[in-house]
Amino acid sequence: TPGNALKGDNPEHVEIIKRIARQNITRQPDVFIQISVPNEFQKVGKYNIGITAGIETTNVSHEFLQGCNNMDLILVTSEHSKKGFVDTVYDKVDEKTKQKTGDLKLTTPMEVLFEGVDTNVYYKTNDLHDTIKDELSSIKNPFCYLFVGHWLKGNIGQDRKDVGMMIKTFCETFKNKAARNRTALILKTSHATFSIIDRDHITKKVQEIIAPYGNKAPEIYFLHGDLSDEEMNSLYNHPKIKAMVSFTKGEGYGRPLLEFSVTGKPVIASNWSGHIDFLKHAVLLPGQLTDNRLPINF
């Protein structure tokens, strides 16, 4: 979730900002809402609501379950996130006897609060921001895939969004294509910041992955920095961007995939985790069926 999600010039955001508890509360609120990781949930109000993306895998920690059970209601971002909490059960064991005394499981009601996408911000358009037009003007490839997301911790094949393996697979797929027809991959990514150190670190990682392919490697472009909503929407709609691709192994929601989908362009993603709440499996390739059998039995 971006740290600049709440804008001071947005009247709706201003009302939210006004209601953020910044000091010690002098009286118990009727309703207390906390957006956090579950192990930090606190029972402060008369009725307490915890909002979390949860965790992007199939099991949650016992600290997360205990934190959720402190609250009166939990709201999560996807059915995938909810399933992880609901399906996780731990044995309660007596420290002295080592005998099971019960189960640790989710006891607080949990609901999915679908985030959706703001179609006043993300929509299909041909009116592109000058920054994006200028940035992509140097790209000569007529067909580009786009990836948007953080490049998280882990070696190739280990990071949660699987960015490194996506790059390697892209190289393997398009390494022998003629340069004039070569497909490109555009990475809009970062680690944790938009610093020069962050940019240089990612650049080095990309270079290490593509190095074995030499001059056979397809073109890979790297966008780094904080783009506005308008700039991101222009990036999604740019005519050189033909599809979005993600090898993600776990999403609490997968917001960029939904934002991109409003363009009507194809989205290639794993059939797993939070984004399948809004991305349905649908592969329709144009073509014609013909009988290609030889005049013999086989």
Describe each PLM feature range:
Residues 18-25, 89-109, 199-219:
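Short mixed-charge
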Residues 73-131:
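Donor nucleotide-sugar binding/catalytic pocket of nucleotide-sugar-dependent glycosyltransferases
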Residues 119-234:
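Conserved catalytic-core segment of nucleotide-activated headgroup transferases in glycan assembly
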Residues 234-252, 262-265:
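Acidic donor-binding loop of glycosyltransferase active sites
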Residues 254-257, 272:
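Short glycine/serine-rich donor-binding loops of glycosyltransferases
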Residues 266-269, 283-284:
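Short hydrophobic beta-strand element within catalytic cores of glycosyltransferases
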